[in-house]
């Protein structure tokens, strides 16, 4: 099959197996080039391990620390006629490289919100690893079924308190127009917290602790984004922000649960990046396009893997972590530098459809977006026939 990108709205509906594998190799090469991380984890569970920050966490743990990794994700394998999801192909690529390097890598494909998948992960840890010393929680999902009640909850991306109107870039048509998003009602806020908040992170840690598969001094991290003035109305001071605040509540609760093990739980605040999740959030594509332009000009731009390597070396595995007063690791300090934000804010009102490619790095944004799905990757022949049904040995 010749595989070319099929983009609809903010999602690419197909993926390229070889492009995704090359993407993973590129991230692995970066980690190897940085050198080994001192006193890093040795046995790691990554919940949401197949794309974005979760995948970068798995790569950093394995190739920066020599860790055995168990990944949990919900991805679609390819068939003879249809490509699988990018996350599936990323995981195939990761497994291949881990095997070459003699590193333990196992994966579970299923709904991480369910009790069944938690039990399966615990069984694999008991069988193969004994105990894990790091648990990364990096799930991004629009829906969640509560395992206790069976009720399905859906999240919304809406402001809180009042509707919000702002400039928005339609990445399909490249049209720029004001977009008004109505304020969320109380039920929508509560449902978004239920899906994207810290409850499931807590349930995972509780299940792992109860099963006695957490090592002494085990650490756990969950990821968030805070942003600044331009993104606050749709992010920080919105339904997604309320859900992310719930992560702080969960971190405090988990810390208490891990106290007798000498363990710790922290939220890590990361920078804005092109991911499958961020591309779905109104305003973010335009904001990220401007941010990329300014950060690249200043030489401070980082991708997922650079952020994660730094989180390990400057946050989780150092005696002097960059923590804020809410006990969160801060890896967004370059994005939030006052001078840099001032430049972004100055560009924002001047962007038009005519000057989009001069005033912003939309070209870079779009290239990164396609790369998430394995397209536009250097060294890949996209005219070549490739088999979409790639096998992955799953638990």
From Swiss-Prot:
Q: Which gene encodes it?
A: fabV
Q: Keyword Oxidoreductase on this protein?
A: yes
**Record's InterPro entries?**
Eno_Rdtase_FAD-bd_dom (IPR024906), Enoyl-CoA_Rdtase_cat_dom (IPR024910), FabV-like_NADH_b (IPR050048), Trans-2-enoyl-CoA_reductase (IPR010758)
Q: What does this protein do, in the record's words?
A: Involved in the final reduction of the elongation cycle of fatty acid synthesis (FAS II). Catalyzes the reduction of a carbon-carbon double bond in an enoyl moiety that is covalently linked to an acyl carrier protein (ACP).
One of the entry's Gene Ontology molecular-function terms is:
trans-2-enoyl-CoA reductase (NADH) activity
What name appears for this protein in its UniProt entry?
Answer: Enoyl-[acyl-carrier-protein] reductase [NADH]
Which region is the signal sequence? none
Q: Where does NAD(+) bind?
A: 48-53, 74-75, 111-112, 139-140, 244, 273-275
**Alphabetically, which GO biological process terms does the record hold?**
fatty acid biosynthetic process
Question: What family is reported?
Answer: Belongs to the TER reductase family.
Residues of the site described as Plays an important role in discriminating NADH against NADPH: 75
User: Short name of one Pfam family for this protein?
Assistant: Eno-Rase_FAD_bd
Annotated residues that bind substrate are located at 225
Q: Can you name the source organism? A: Saccharophagus degradans (strain 2-40 / ATCC 43961 / DSM 17024)
Q: Which residues form the active site?
A: 235
EC number(s) per UniProt?
1.3.1.9
Q: What is the top-level taxon of the source organism?
A: Bacteria
Record keywords: Fatty acid biosynthesis, Fatty acid metabolism, Lipid biosynthesis, Lipid metabolism, NAD, Oxidoreductase
The chemistry this enzyme catalyses reads: a 2,3-saturated acyl-[ACP] + NAD(+) = a (2E)-enoyl-[ACP] + NADH + H(+)
This protein's pathway: Lipid metabolism; fatty acid biosynthesis
Subunit structure, interactors included: Monomer.
């Amino acid at each position: 099959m010749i595989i070319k990108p099929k983009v609809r709205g903010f999602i690419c509906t197909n993926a390229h197996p070889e492009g995704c594998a090359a993407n993973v190799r590129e991230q692995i090469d970066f980690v190897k080039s940085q050198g080994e991380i001192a006193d890093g984890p040795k046995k790691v569970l990554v919940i949401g391990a197949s794309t974005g920050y979760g995948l970068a966490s798995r790569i950093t743990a394995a190739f920066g620390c020599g860790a055995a990794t168990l990944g949990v994700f919900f991805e679609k394998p390819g068939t003879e006629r249809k490509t699988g999801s990018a996350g599936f192909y990323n995981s195939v690529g990761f497994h291949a490289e881990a095997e070459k390097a003699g590193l333990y890598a196992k994966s579970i494909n299923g709904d991480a919100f369910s009790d069944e998948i938690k039990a399966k992960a615990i069984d694999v840890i008991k069988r193969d690893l004994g105990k894990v010393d790091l648990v990364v929680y990096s799930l991004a999902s629009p829906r969640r079924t509560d395992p206790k009640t069976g009720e399905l909850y859906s999240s919304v991306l809406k402001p809180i308190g009042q509707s919000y109107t702002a400039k928005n870039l339609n990445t399909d048509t490249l049209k720029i127009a004001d977009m008004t998003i109505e304020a969320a009602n109380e039920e929508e806020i509560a449902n978004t917290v239920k899906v994207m908040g810290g409850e499931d992170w807590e349930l995972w840690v509780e299940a792992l602790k109860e099963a006695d598969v957490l090592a002494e001094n085990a650490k756990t991290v969950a990821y968030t984004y805070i942003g600044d003035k331009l993104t606050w109305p749709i992010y920080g001071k919105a339904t997604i922000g309320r859900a992310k605040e719930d992560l702080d509540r969960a971190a405090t609760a988990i810390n208490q649960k891990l106290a007798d093990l000498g363990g710790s739980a922290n939220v890590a605040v990361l920078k804005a990046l092109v991911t499958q999740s961020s591309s779905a959030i109104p305003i973010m594509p335009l904001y990220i396009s401007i941010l990329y332009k300014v950060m690249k000009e200043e030489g401070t731009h980082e991708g997922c893997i650079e952020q994660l390597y730094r989180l390990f070396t400057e946050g989780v595995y150092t005696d002097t972590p960059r923590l804020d007063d809410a006990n969160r690791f801060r890896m967004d300090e370059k994005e939030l530098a006052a001078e840099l934000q001032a430049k972004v804010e100055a560009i924002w009102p001047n962007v038009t459809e005519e000057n989009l490619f001069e005033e912003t790095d939309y070209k870079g944004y779009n290239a990164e977006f396609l790369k998430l799905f394995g397209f536009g990757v250097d060294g890949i022949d996209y005219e070549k026939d490739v088999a979409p049904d790639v096998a992955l040995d799953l638990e």
